[in-house]
Amino acid sequence: CPRSVMLYLLHKGNREGVTYQGGQHQIVHLVADVPNTVAWADEAGLRWAFTLSNAGSGYFEYRSDLADLSEVNWDAVAAKTWSGTGVSRDIKEGKQAEFLVEQRFPWHLLIGIGVYSQAQGEHVTRLTTGLSHKPQIKVLRHWYYP
């Protein structure tokens, strides 16, 4: 999710209970195709779901049928402004929708890795040297906070 709420908290360094203090520049976005992921999870006998808000909250709703993806507030997911005066609580909640797979996620399902900068992209390229599966690494600066 571009400019996620959690990324903002990491960027600002003000999330109680989170020991990571490295800011947003070292965070990568792992991109996968949802239908392919669901097919893999079903075949592996693993549960998957997507939520309509933050899965860490005590009141989230989840779905496990791709036909229900239309219930995700996609405008909220894409929103650049998700808090503050005049912004609906539905936007902040919807911005935190998540797709989850239990236990594990296989490397071969990744189709892309979004990074903050060219330098970070080069670092990720070095880390993936020698791997048979190479997701596309792309600088996606607009997915990060200014």
Region annotations inferred by a language model:
Residues 2-146:
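Active-site-proximal loop/hinge segments that shape catalytic or ion-binding/gating pockets
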